[in-house]
Amino acid sequence: MAFGYSPSYCSFWRTLLGLYCLFTLVHTVISTPPEDPVKCVSGNTNCIVTNSLGAFPDRSTCRAANVAYPTTEAELVSIVAAATKAGRKMRVTTRYSHSIPKLTCTDGNDGLFISTKFLNHTVQADAKAMTLTVESGVTLRQLIAEAAKVGLALPYAPYWWGVTVGGMMGTGAHGSSLWGKGSAVHDYVTEIRMVSPGSVNDGFAKIRVLSETTTPNEFNAAKVSLGVLGVISQVTFELQPMFKRSLKYVMRNDLDFNDEALTFGKKHEFADFVWLPSQGKVVYRMDDRVAVNTLGNGLYDFFPFRSQLSAVLATTRSSEETQETLRDAHGKCVTATTISSTLFSTSYGLTNNGITFTGYPVIGSQNRMMSSGSCLDGLEDKLTSACAWDSRVKGVFYHQTTFSIPLTQVKSFINDIKSLLKIDSKSLCGLELYYGILMRYVTSSPAYLGKETEAIDFDITYYRANDPLTPRLYEDFIEEIEQIALLKYNALPHWGKNRNLAFDGVIKKYKNAPAFLKVKESYDPNGLFSSEWTDQILGIKGNPTIVKDGCALEGLCICSDDAHCAPSKGYLCRPGKVYKEARVCTHVPK
């Protein structure tokens, strides 16, 4: 039976989808926890690794002959020594593997994955010195909880607590702030213990103890290491006395947002924005530190990080696939408005007492307000529910383009995006289906591969097709924004996110890159912890872009020929609409 796609039919399904979105955002159930990202054919041999989305940007399969699961630093030393002696390639994997690029991949099929899954212990908590030493496989959630036990707090961190200490150090993970030392987790680290390849005299493995006072050059290299210096075994954090935060969200139009973005971060310590460009709105996060004895027991359990019913996830994904197939821009905009208004009206998951939301401001202790991820907490329920992006169910599947624009250029960049919207106001509704454009403040860091200056980090998430050769609705608009950021404003891509093209020539953007590479050569002269991917992004050998038919559709290249898009489906390589130097895959009706 064939069904006509009438306006009333469209309206019905948009309404139904809106109800599904509402149910998904506010429903919390027991959730099947994510599976181990490493899977082996037999025991710990003949293994593959993937990321939390179930697919790397180029959709390749990363293999290794074995995986090792050390439980102590001594075991880690033994594992690294044996692999070094044998000349085997090694890469580190984590419990949840949330980095999108191929940072966990080793070369060929004969390498070794070293998982930090069981290096997840607290080594020492010193309330008097206000320090906490943990193993590198400790998750952010554990770190926050262990600090709170002794009355201490990590001041800034990512909003998702499923990342590990080693993963945060490897990719430069951060929260949002221009205050203090800034929002990067690695800038609150005082000591790093790392196991690197060693010489025969070292027994083929060497424990290195790094700090700002004793080994400043090596310490600044290790703070954002991409995993190429060795395996971090332990990290010591400098913490602060526990404090509370007072948070409220305010939605405004974006008419003066260009100017507000430059100054808002100076007014509020934990400020950020969610920009809804197609709706012409911005959600301002007014978030400040208050005394620990201030009344309030608030909790932030962010709705999109809660578990979701798999049936609801499948329906929502199917609806967006239909919108893509039918080029239903209006439908996407209606759904986006439903999602954003629902999130705002339900305070994004904030409650004043851990149960209900009664009004702003929400005041709570730092450990209850800074990060969340309750979809990780559940017991096995046979995938009746899961984290929204769990690849074992039909859920969200997306690209994530994330980059830092210097604060001095943010106004101009926002104006460029607004200029694109003037051409077609519906062009960015697809971003608002995925929360909108999250904007976080970052500052310059002494880490050699850390941020270079005060900046705003733009986090853009959008639909990814199951078929890599299927183009997206308004693909050209998002590609142009990506190229405006990277090429016009020389933006720095987030090491743990992004598509391949973002890393083309990236190492030239870091003034301390030569110093980093010098430490790398000293620590691992044979490149045992390096891979084809890390060599490409560090400018050592090769290029991260992949030029082939359809390569621009998945961000593997910037198109220079129609074949790099989808000419059979009407998508051709054309100049940008605002930034003429851009080359984007544009739908050209026949």
UniProtKB/Swiss-Prot annotation:
Cofactor requirements of the protein: FAD
Catalytic activity from the UniProt record: L-gulono-1,4-lactone + O2 = L-ascorbate + H2O2 + H(+)
Protein EC: 1.1.3.8
Keyword annotations from UniProtKB, A to Z: Ascorbate biosynthesis, FAD, Flavoprotein, Oxidoreductase, Signal
Domain FAD-binding PCMH-type residue range list: 60-242
Family the entry assigns: Belongs to the oxygen-dependent FAD-linked oxidoreductase family.
Function comment: Catalyzes the oxidation of L-gulono-1,4-lactone to ascorbic acid. L-gulono-1,4-lactone is oxidized to hydrogen peroxide and L-xylo-hexulonolactone which spontaneously isomerizes to L-ascorbate.
Protein name (Swiss-Prot/TrEMBL): L-gulonolactone oxidase 5
Lineage, top ranks: Eukaryota, Viridiplantae, Streptophyta, Embryophyta, Tracheophyta
Gene coding for it: GULLO5
